[in-house]
Amino acid sequence: MATLQDIGVSAGINILSAFVFFIIFAVLRLQPFNDRVYFSKWYLKGLRSSPARGGAFAQRFVNLDFRSYMKFLNWMPEALKMPEPELIDHAGLDSVVYLRIYWLGLKIFTPIAVLAWAVLVPVNWTNNTLEMAKQLRNVTSSDIDKLSVSNIPEYSMRFWTHIVMAYAFTIWTCYVLMKEYETIANMRLQFVASEARRPDQFTVLVRNVPPDADESVSELVEHFFLVNHPDHYLTHQVVCNANKLADLVKKKKKLQNWLDYYQLKYARNNSQRIMVKLGFLGLWGQKVDAIEHYIAEIDKISKEISKEREEVVNDPKAIMPAAFVSFKTRWAAAVCAQTQQTRNPTQWLTEWAPEPRDVFWSNLAIPYVSLTVRRLIMHVAFFFLTFFFIVPIAFVQSLATIEGIVKAAPFLKFIVDDKFMKSVIQGFLPGIALKLFLAFLPSILMIMSKFEGFTSISSLERRAAFRYYIFNLVNVFLASVIAGAAFEQLNSFLNQSANQIPKTIGVAIPMKATFFITYIMVDGWAGVAGEILMLKPLIMFHLKNAFLVKTDKDREEAMDPGSIGFNTGEPRIQLYFLLGLVYAPVTPMLLPFILVFFALAYIVYRHQIINVYNQEYESAAAFWPDVHGRVIAALVISQLLLMGLLGTKHAALAAPFLIALPVLTIGFHHFCKGRYEPAFIRYPLQEAMMKDTLETAREPNLNLKGYLQNAYVHPVFKGDEDDYDIDDKLGKFEDEAIIVPTKRQSRRNTPAPSIISGDDSPSLPFSGKLV
């Protein structure tokens, strides 16, 4: 078990690491050749030019102004200067609300920490229960545990203090959550009301279009919406399966990068042609001329791309039973997106379309009927992933409990002979080991989310974040506590009756605070400080700049600003909320470490959002109900654990008074859900009508159809250098097929005449396009 000395060694290592990271960052950010890495957002907005273009040759690469190095931490106050309204305009509402999660942590835990240290620490410290348990029952403990509830004897009246504090912590947390929910809801409504025109405001995604033997998907979609939304339907774009085409385009881009590299290399030294080997990684195989080889490969794959495009456009099997349908007004889109279209609730399913940059195109090709099966498979896979990950978690706990294991395994005693090494192993290594084990988890969870078939990047990230949160709850928290308790009290477990084991675990739960303190310092202190260095984007930018960049456009594409990473960042924040709320009434020693994390992370990520991150999408803070719900879950878990802990301490008179807390907390959650959540899942028709009215008054001659015409065209049909225009293949729908007649024997309320019946109907234009 980590002692106070071990915690001190870990704190020293992590504080030193964070300080070194900040110094390195301060030096690197001042160098002109790194300007595009550490200020990439300003370059993407076109508001910053490279300082390396002017001045002396040396000044283009190295900052020779030594006065700038004297203020190496001035980026911290600068990150706090930009006011929130300006930050919303600069980075979007998603980024600002994400920052408010850190601010929420500070608002919740600062008063809680002050109250806990003022009231609970003296109550816990003035007892000798652990000393007596150590002598009588051979229970392992440290000086830090004397500040916890474990140090209070059974049947003590002092437990009433912890119950009163639990009520105080709950009331304060719920109050802050309610005020924040109200603020975020108002920010969202105001943001949506003042937001510039976007295609997704007028568009819905229609899925599970029923098959029809007589009509194509495009014709069927048009007929359905002309009949059921006759005054509001504007245009649509059917979805196609272009995944194979997208893979070919991606492969061609890689080949083009290699060709650019070898052409640039040959231009610098044209004394001899460049030769490459065709074998694995260029280590063996036939030698060929590099430039000629890649020109031939690009020509070959270009022909494949053209052929695949023809197949996608002309093959009915490539057309999916889904479409992006656009309307003349936001009001009409809101009505369609938020209502059931037919008596069969499994057909003609409508939802708000993601904004074009948020669409995850490859998943649109997944048949809707297979989504349930896919999600069931992923639920099972996630269960086994979570279950089997308990093994490395138990290994991490063994690193954190050397002293306890030595009691049962004396041959390991040589490990703890050196006090400093023992402090490093127990105070630093467990946190590092756990962080390494979790390194690949976000990628695995994102792959699982993609397999489930979500159609937008934002929904993918929210699902991955939810699974990461559950994983942290089960493995990082619960498994660490249970496995750690078993390791720490191993000798006690082996020499006591079975009915005494729950009591030993109850005493041991607060003792795991030492492990979580070390993890917070590794992940929340040094880890957050290391984020600002951006080592991977920095290295990749300079490699691309050296070998691939030929133009300013190439240099812009070489930048990798990244984003806030909701799927990884938010679950980590929620783990700290969970730890803080669980240990606030149990071991207040942990709270200052959490406060340092929230304060440091708020400053670092505010700087990154202002200067670096380029958000991939804008959901107008649609994720906030998830954030609120997980904090509530952490609060309920903390109450249940405290109730169980007091039960093991035989606080029979005091413990029942905690039963009301989870009930009241869940009731509070339902109140907030009913009061504020509708602003995040539905678009008020009143707001939509107001925005439409204002836009009509300001732009009476707006060509909305032209604005929406190509908004949801698949990216593989856009901006390619090949002389290919999808409208050339589908222009007949615009020019020749002004009216799309039905081909059925009988059809009521058809806005176009039937080919067979010849009934008259008003002419209505068709504007369907292929996505």
Curated annotation (Swiss-Prot):
Signal peptide: none annotated. It is a multi-pass membrane protein. Activated by hyperosmotic shock after mannitol or NaCl treatment. Activated by mechanical pressure: activated in response to membrane stretch and poke. Membrane lipids play a key role in mechanosensation by acting as a wall mainly formed by lipid head groups. Residues 1-4, 126-156, 402-419, 486-504, 589, 649-651 are extracellular. Residues 28-100, 179-374, 446-462, 534-566, 606-625, 671-771 are cytoplasmic. Keywords: Calcium, Ion channel, Ion transport, Membrane, Transmembrane, Transmembrane helix, Transport. Residues 741-771 are annotated as: Disordered. It is found in: Membrane. Homodimer. Acts as an osmosensitive calcium-permeable cation channel. Specifically conducts cations including Ca(2+), K(+) and Na(+) in vitro. Inactivation or closure of the channel is calcium-dependent. Mechanosensitive ion channel that converts mechanical stimuli into a flow of ions: activated in response to membrane stretch and poke. This is Hyperosmolality-gated Ca2+ permeable channel 1.2. It comes from Arabidopsis thaliana. The lineage of its organism: Eukaryota, Viridiplantae, Streptophyta, Embryophyta, Tracheophyta.
